[in-house]
UniProtKB/Swiss-Prot annotation:
Substrate binds at residues 12-14, 175, 214, 235-236. It holds the Pfam family TIM. It comes from Agrobacterium fabrum (strain C58 / ATCC 33970) (Agrobacterium tumefaciens (strain C58)). It catalyses: D-glyceraldehyde 3-phosphate = dihydroxyacetone phosphate. GO terms for cellular component: cytosol. GO terms for molecular function: triose-phosphate isomerase activity. Its EC number is 5.3.1.1. Disulfide bonds: none annotated. This is Triosephosphate isomerase.
């Protein structure tokens, strides 16, 4: 954790979830009510088909709702895409950009991710900018070089601690059950913090840096307790309310 930084526990449902899944969001919305919500933010990013209904379900809950991607343009002939303005119109508060699955499946570049983050900022959405190295890059000892390049290329100049969150997701750890050691996480997050401070000054000291990659109830407390880890971006474990709330509850000990 970073002193004086409010943690964020975020769930990315990816291409999962139908109307029947709204029961899980209802349970999460109830589960995050209480004293811990005054210290820790909770966010779920369902598929776009559920975005508006999910925000309505959370109207009287501190549970935040966001989207998984946005187009870099406001409007236009972009079949199948969703704009940042559309997300804001559905009362979403956050949007994930640059997830490794988007970078791989859709060949998204740092330049494009940067444009998407800027589009989010234009309509007062908080951009969650994802970065991380592949297994081959890790084996080649390139982790820090990749993080430096992606931070420099993916973050727009107007990024602040208020409108931007960084999510470090080692690509090789996503959905594999593999996780880096706490020392690996500590070194990566310390490096990113230094890079953010070099570029953004004091704002870089309090930008939230999340860890993502096979986060689950069994390892949440250990991972979230690492210095400069300001929360989690959770995949599969966010699909069930019980698992998501268990990870969220790790902060009951960490913030005591």
């Amino acid at each position: 954790m970073t002193p004086n930084v409010r943690p964020l526990v975020a769930g990315n449902w990816k291409m999962n979830g139908t109307r029947a899944s709204l029961d899980q969001i209802k349970a999460m919305a109830e589960g995050v009510k209480g004293a811990l919500s005054e210290k820790v933010d909770a966010l779920i990013c369902p598929p776009s088909t559920l975005l508006y209904v999910a925000t309505a379900l959370c109207d009287d809950s501190p549970l935040l709702i966001g989207a998984q991607d946005c187009h870099q343009n406001d409007t236009g002939a972009h079949t199948g895409d969703i704009s940042a303005e559309m997300i804001a119109d559905c009362f979403g508060t956050h949007v994930i950009v640059g997830h490794s699955e988007r970078r791989t499946d859709h060949a998204e570049t740092d330049h494009l991710v940067r444009a998407k983050a800027s589009a989010a900022h234009q309509v007062d959405l908080i951009a969650i900018v994802c970065i991380g190295e592949t297994a081959d890059e890790r084996k080649a000892g390139q982790t820090l070089d990749i993080l430096k390049r992606q931070l420099a290329g993916s973050l727009p100049d107007e990024a602040t601690a208020e409108n931007t969150v960084i999510a470090y997701e080692p690509v090789w750890a996503i959905g594999t059950g593999l996780t880096p050691t706490t020392q690996d996480v500590r070194e990566a997050h310390a490096f990113m913090r230094d890079e953010l401070v070099k570029r953004f000054g004091d704002a870089g000291k309090t930008m939230r840096i999340l860890y993502g990659g096979s986060v689950k109830p069994a390892n949440a407390l250990e991972l979230m307790g690492v210095e400069n880890v300001d929360g989690a971006l959770i995949g599969g474990a966010s699909l069930k309310a019980a698992d998501f709330l268990s990870i969220y509850a790790a902060y009951e000990q960490l913030t005591a």
